[in-house]
Structures are given as C-alpha cells and as structure tokens.
Amino acid sequence: MTPISAPAEPAAIPLRTGGVAGSSAPEAWFRQYGVPFTRNVSTATLTPFLPDPAKATGAAVIVAPGGGFLMLSMEAEGWAVARALAARGIAAFVLKYRVKPTPAGMADFEQAVSAMFASAGRSDSRMRPDDAVAGLANPIADARAAFALVRSRATEWKVDPARVGMIGFSAGAMTTMVTTLAAPDARPAFIAPIYGSMEAVKVPANAPPMFAVLAADDPLFAHKGFGLIDAWQTAGRPVEFHLYEKGGHGFGLGKKGTTSPGWFSAFVSWLDANGFLKPTQ
C-alpha cells in the first residue's frame, strides 16, 4: 500500500448524510494492486457517469465498491465499472459511502486490514446480511440518499426512475443486499451482488430480480453454500447466478487468464433480457 494524493473528483456530489462517529483521521488515498483506494471516508458522495445520449437506454445503476468497510476500491470496483456501464448506454453512479474509521498510520492500517481478511476467510466465518443491517446504518443511509438523488434528477440525467438498480462488490455487495433488506424506500429495480456473501436472507416481498457472481476459489465466500440463491428461488423471485471456476476475490471486471471477465457481458445481457434496457423514447 503506497500513499498517494487524492485525485480530483469534480463531478462528485455530496450526499449530505452526515459524518462518522469516532472518526478523527482525514480521508486518505493509497495505491494497491496498481489501482487507487480510499479510506476514512466520512463524507459520502455520488459521481455520475452518463452515457452518450444517442446510446442511453434509460437504465441506471448505483455502483458500490468493496473494501471490507475499511476502504473503498474506487477504480477497479467503482469508476472502471461505471465507465463500462456508460459505454453500454447505462447511466452509472459511483457511491463513495462512509466506512469505518481506521488508524492514520499506514502500518497500523495494513495490520487492521490483514486482521479483517484473516477473520473473514475462516471456514466458520459467516457474514449474514440479516445480522449485518444494524451495524451498517451509514452505508444504508448513503445508498438511500443515492437512490433519492438519482430519481430526483432523473429527467436531467435521462434516467427512468423505475429502472434504477444497484451493483456492489464484496462489501459493496453487502451494502447492496442490506439496502434491499432494510430500506424499502430505495426500491432498487434490480440488484447485482458481485463476489459477496452467499448466506441466506429473509427475502422481502416483491424483492427485485438478482444477478449474482462468485468465483469457486474465492477465499472469503466460496465453499460456504449458496443460501442466498436458494432463498431467492424459494421466494419465487427472479435470480441468475454465475459461479466461475477461478477468479479469487476482488477481480472487478474480471481476472485475466480466467473466464471471470465474462460476467459483465452476461450482466448486460441479463438486464436486456429482463427488459431493463428498453431505450428511452
């Protein structure tokens, strides 16, 4: 992890959802795996990535990066995904949601991250969305504000308010799921948890269609069953699930040398097949 200067975010819109209790260290950026991350986020923002009006479908996706609620993978699981969606005519909005406070020093932060992933990777570790709701009030509030903002500016952004969904990666997948479970006013039209927890949930009535992705060699969530998929099926709600042989965890748009890059095109095809990409008239 190498500290870097904060990049310019001229299009970022403050969501005005408040700060983070107990946070004293400022927001800090660093580079890991060759891409930028941020941590100690105490002010939530939403950054629009709008498609060429000639290609716009009217669909929109709120994009929630992952990072264990200690950091956010802004490029690989945020901006890059948003650019790819916009290129397909889908308006994308990267949600920089509030995360837990971390030590100001990089060495102490790295130690905290290592401990978190070691705990999450235990075979007996269970990250149940139903149980996580109470501890994720900030990300849920940020996601709710994001949905409200997109719908309030739908005409300006050429978005159909009824076709606003959410995609999230790892912790962002958890944010997507707890928002679906605990924030009925968000009303995501569809959800896409990408390499998130596969634990079963109590599926809400009229739960949105779900597109889920996981790698069979994911060190955090593989080999722990597919309760989430089973729960959606049992509830009679639409679900599509892609399990890739290899990809590990945190592969973003896909890991080279594996079939995991196929998930993005499959997701867009799924949106189309479910009627979410009907072009705006």
How should these model regions be labeled?
Residues 64, 194, 244-247:
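Alpha/beta-hydrolase
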Residues 84-89, 228, 232, 271:
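Hydrophobic alpha-helical packing residues
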Residues 212-214:
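Short beta-strand/loop motif that positions the catalytic acidic residue
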